[in-house]
Amino acid sequence: MKITLVGNGRMGRQIADVVAASGAHVVNRVLDVNDTIDAAAFSGSDVIIDFTVRSAFLANYPALIASGVPVVVGTTGWDDVMPQVREEVVKARSTMLYSANYSLGVNIFFRTLREAARLIAPFEQFDIALSEQHHTGKADFPSGTAIKAADEILNSNPRKRTIVRELQEGRKLQSDELQVASIRLGSVFGVHSAIIDSESDTIELTHTAKNRTGFASGAVRAAEWLVQRHATSPGFYTMDDFLNDLFSA
């Protein structure tokens, strides 16, 4: 499998290391976030893996779609335009997979959280909130992973209807609001926690990333899956689509 990497930052370099160690695939091209990109840049590639920033992705995604090469996207912070991107992917009969986090471990965390949120829904004594920690270089907050975790809760627990990213002084949190607290600290790779609390006890679910290897390995594995899916069923996919196949195999 010939892979073009869009983005030569920490995640891009980690993916290149994982690919080199596997011996099964090759990175045939690396495009920098500041490069001018058109569809021809992806000629000869089997799959594209994009880990850039919001502004670069928004500038580049038309070329990604037009290339006809399946695209794995790990860039976060563009949820507001996702419906538009999805529509363009489907219209062009292209193939794209998006996830805020490709780590298998964190996706098991999502599924565990989904079930926990569903289980506490009938019991009003249990409240729930989220927190996330990342290094000081991470620009977006809450993280894409935290937003995905919040969506899991909102979709599984009807008592929570909206996300609150910041609390103003003197403002009381409403019972139907889900607080998502963000911390930027040092060189933390990523810590995501769900806290479920009642008068009697507290339950904590936490995923801690020790390094970027899990993210990179998951992205490469997702790329393998997407290449096969592109051949038979082009479209816009999420990590859940990939994991449903993976866990049912």
Curated annotation (Swiss-Prot):
The keyword NAD applies. One of its GO terms (cellular component) is cytosol. It catalyses: (S)-2,3,4,5-tetrahydrodipicolinate + NAD(+) + H2O = (2S,4S)-4-hydroxy-2,3,4,5-tetrahydrodipicolinate + NADH + H(+); (S)-2,3,4,5-tetrahydrodipicolinate + NADP(+) + H2O = (2S,4S)-4-hydroxy-2,3,4,5-tetrahydrodipicolinate + NADPH + H(+). It comes from the Bacteria. Its EC number is 1.17.1.8. One of its GO terms (molecular function) is oxidoreductase activity, acting on CH or CH2 groups, NAD or NADP as acceptor. Belongs to the DapB family. This is 4-hydroxy-tetrahydrodipicolinate reductase.
